[in-house]
């Protein structure tokens, strides 16, 4: 995962990454390295990080922790949801790309002081609405266009947050929420109010935690 930690003046930020690389076979391992690139919205490279060489000898995973100070990045807010592009590439030692993941992310810091919510050091009133992943014609198979239309309506009515009642949404929903400047109260997939006895059974504890 990726996290951002702004300094006391909410100017510069530490970009922090914790990356798990999993190996599923007993094949002989070779040396790899992880390359991380951060791009702005003009496709200009902001920074690049490279891990030390590593290998995974058997089935299992390797955890890598990387960080870099980013000077005065553009901040994400609900009114100006600026997003960077982060690409992580798993490379062999000759530079060949074995695998890659790309995502968009924003630099922001959220805090709760007393009973107040702050974004990047600024007091923010949270205006939230419940949202179900359902449509009168499409059912639960909501398309990207439908989700965008929902978010456009929410923004027109000055909402800056949405609660995914009562289950986690698809990843595209979360990606678009970042794009539109919406905080997401993402509910875990433990909906059981129709049969509440499930939540009282200890054997379901670990399943609940995993979700």
Residue ranges and their predicted role:
Residues 127, 189-210:
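Active-site-adjacent "subsite" loops/lids of carbohydrate-active enzymes
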Residues 1-184, 206-211:
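Secreted/periplasmic carbohydrate-active enzymes, especially glycoside hydrolases
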